[in-house]
């Protein structure tokens, strides 16, 4: 047995030795053969002209090392092959499928290392999937290493795609297919390390993405001197791409992020930071087709921060639309994909904070909106120094508007929204606010009848709320220590009639848009103010947003009003001046979009009225005497109630309708029943006319008698 076993071992060892010798000989022989025949094989089988000074091939492992390589295309204009032109200092390939490379034109390797490559790469033309063209990948690099390379990558039509200098790159599990290139996600990989300078990426000949330097350290990428530069002007972009709506220009001192993942048609980034970004948005009049796909892949961003940014948006004519300065923001868990793009908010998000200063917005040629700061997070929004101001004076405004329109002037030192929630339920926007606080607001509303009437009815607040397309609810609103002024003028007024409400404090409950079924749609407004700055006034105003007739109730009580204070209001229209004390004014109006009606009651002490001429300069003494004669002192007596009934024939605003109701009540209370005055005046005129007629008759009678007497004397003289 021992002899047989020893003999078997000798035979086995001898066989192994023979195989090793044969393997070595084959490897050496193949290596020798390949070195001598590879140029001829490349010439016959490869689409490239390749020269080298050193080549080492291991047939067993598929490892290849080549040095001082020069490469170029045999057919530079063939768009079906990847174009390669340039040199490589050293090339190291591990586990290459040699026969696939030589005979099937497919490069399949575990690892490839390029040392000092200076290459110009032209991508092959994407395959037409509809024609069933073979989409087999010509290059399969699992792991890629680049050391100190200068790379230019062009599209098949020679348009620039990527340029980078001094590139050092490490990619693991790298994949690239024609399909991904077509969908704008050209590569996917598991991990990376990169550094380079003067990076340029061109997107659809619309933008150049530039970076002075790119580097990674400990998994974090830093991009310095970033620029997203448009290749077209705003006008050229609008003409060439009529279905695109915005052109962007972006610069940033530095961008950093980590945990970049390109996988399964998804891009993921974390800890994204922008330092001093400057964003310019140039809008056009283009409209994107509804069927257009907005996202070819998913984007996930976690923990984004922006520091000291500026944002400017331009209108299609190049003028400023809005501007944000000194912007700082933080946001996490952002998701953008095809599904989210269908919603009113085109992305999902988690916690966020935002702060900006010197915000300016031009909503149109008549106004400019600005604020000194805006600070917000998931729970609270604070606005400082809000202003909404006209861009022209009242005369210019009246000349420029085609029809009658109110002119607003608004200044608010501080606005707070506390406990708000913005959701995107079923791709529909929904906003809910617990508390809205407005501090020390100044609002002036000026209305003029000088321009032609607007045939379009002015909408009340209930209709304005109904027209908001998404559910909006503000549970509690407070207007604190504010001033509201309403002025109106017409052709006959020498100065605008003016109402003012100082020390205005208002509580509003349940502002809503009547978009949530089963929810309360009644809005209640409770207010306290000083009418004309001196007279305590309370107001209760209610309306139902869901009421199609825009019905409302408006109840007010005014006390201790110096009658002279209302002259600014009544003199321009009624041509009346008052003095004395108005003890109280009470009215309870019910109205809708067709008119207003209700009781108006005023008590007074020593109230005197002066009727003026149309220029409000001369007193009509006699009519003033008669008017005051008919006005009774209501102290201690039951005052007379005026029943207001005013029709909204001109379809003016709610403020105008309230004005007309109050004006009607004041006119009835101050002047009284004008028919009595008119009757008295008519009676006096009639009596005066009768007296005059009697006097004239007597004069005529005396003249007749005198004429007869004179005739008799003349006749007597003739006889004599």
Question: For each predicted feature, which ranges?
Answer:
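Flexible, surface-exposed loop regions and adjacent strand-edge segments
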Residues: 122-130, 286-290, 451-457, 573, ...
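Acidic/polar low-complexity surface segments
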Residues: 16, 234, 393-395, 452-456
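Extended intrinsically disordered, low-complexity coil regions enriched in Ser, Thr, Gly, Ala
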Residues: 159-164, 319-324, 449, 454
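Extended terminal
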Residues: 2-12, 540-545, 550, 557, ...
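Short, solvent-exposed aromatic-acidic interface loops
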Residues: 229, 279, 389, 530, ...
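Flexible beta-edge/linker motif
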Residues: 48-49, 53-126, 132-165, 172-227, ...
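Solvent-exposed beta-strand/coil patches in large extracellular/periplasmic or lumenal scaffold regions
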Residues: 131-154, 291-316, 355-357, 420-425, ...
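N-terminal type II signal-anchor transmembrane helix
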Residues: 2-47, 158
